[in-house]
């Protein structure tokens, strides 16, 4: 779904990505993790083309729809339900075209509306809004009556309703109560397309994702599994690296000791030279 190849990005006097590469599978639910300030939100901006990479390539299918929840929905006079319904741009366009389309095109329009489940859209939107804490009476209220925190929930509801091919969520539980966060966990787990989630909420990283993308030292590493699984795999990887490092260092010390001892002896010069070549071939640690 999302391919990042040899990405390098410098900004604000530092390097965020250093020849980073990763391939995100279609349909994966990915938790993007890394220490604070490492560049997780910056990666989202690069994918959304809000920032431009210096080198490398970020690619996805041309027809792919991408959505993120960057800010609260504006305080408009449009009702809550209609605001969410408008997020399905194709449905909105098809319904509007019914009044102006020539008769011979109406059959095709109605067929497409049926294909995308247009008649079920209001109930689906209402179900999402209910999960995020809105009451049934709120559906007919204008957006201007909701506070900024509730309009953030509307923006999230609209993104979930539109079901983009790639959904980018940055700390989505920050403006949700416990009930809303639990609902979102379950919703994301069964999201029908690819989603990448930045979160400090360990529960959502364990209960909603099936892959974990780790950003560290300018590199991206994709692990299969949730956050707990990622930690186990990372710890095991570090243990194996430490063991390999210790083995190489011991071998290096042994070879160097032989060279230092016998380099000056003519009878051992050939062997010492051979050990020097072996030293040069040892991998850096």
Q: Can you describe what each PLM-predicted range is?
A:
Residues 233-258, 262-285:
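Intracellular alpha-helical coupling/juxtamembrane segments of multi-pass membrane proteins
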Residues 1-246:
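ABC ATP-binding cassette signature C-motif
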């Amino acid at each position: 779904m999302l391919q990042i190849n040899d990405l390098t990005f410098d900004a604000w006097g530092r390097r965020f990505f250093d020849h980073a590469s990763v391939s995100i599978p279609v349909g994966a639910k990915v938790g993007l993790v890394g220490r604070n300030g490492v560049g997780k939100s910056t990666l989202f901006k690069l994918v959304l083309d809000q920032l431009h990479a210096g080198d490398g390539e970020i690619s996805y299918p041309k027809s792919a729809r991408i959505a993120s929840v960057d800010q609260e929905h504006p305080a408009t006079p449009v009702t809550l339900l209609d605001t969410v319904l408008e997020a399905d741009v194709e449905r909105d366009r098809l319904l509007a075209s019914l009044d102006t389309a020539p008769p011979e095109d109406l059959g095709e329009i109605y067929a497409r509306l049926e294909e995308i489940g247009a008649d079920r859209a209001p109930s689906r939107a209402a179900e999402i809004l209910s999960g995020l804490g809105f009451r049934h009476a709120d559906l007919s209220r204008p957006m201007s009556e909701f506070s900024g925190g509730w309009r953030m929930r509307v923006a999230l509801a609209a993104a979930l309703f539109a079901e983009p091919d790639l959904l980018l969520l940055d700390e989505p539980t920050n403006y949700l109560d416990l009930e809303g966060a639990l609902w979102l966990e379950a919703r994301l787990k069964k999201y029908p397309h690819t989603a990448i989630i930045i979160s400090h909420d360990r529960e959502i990283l364990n209960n909603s994702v099936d892959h974990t993308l780790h950003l560290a030292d300018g590199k991206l590493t994709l692990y299969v599994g949730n956050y707990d699984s990622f930690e186990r795999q990372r710890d095991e990887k570090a243990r194996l690296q430490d063991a390999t490092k210790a083995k190489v260092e011991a071998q290096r010390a042994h070879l160097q000791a032989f060279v230092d001892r016998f380099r000056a002896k003519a009878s051992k010069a050939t062997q010492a030279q051979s050990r020097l070549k072996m030293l040069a071939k040892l991998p850096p640690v």
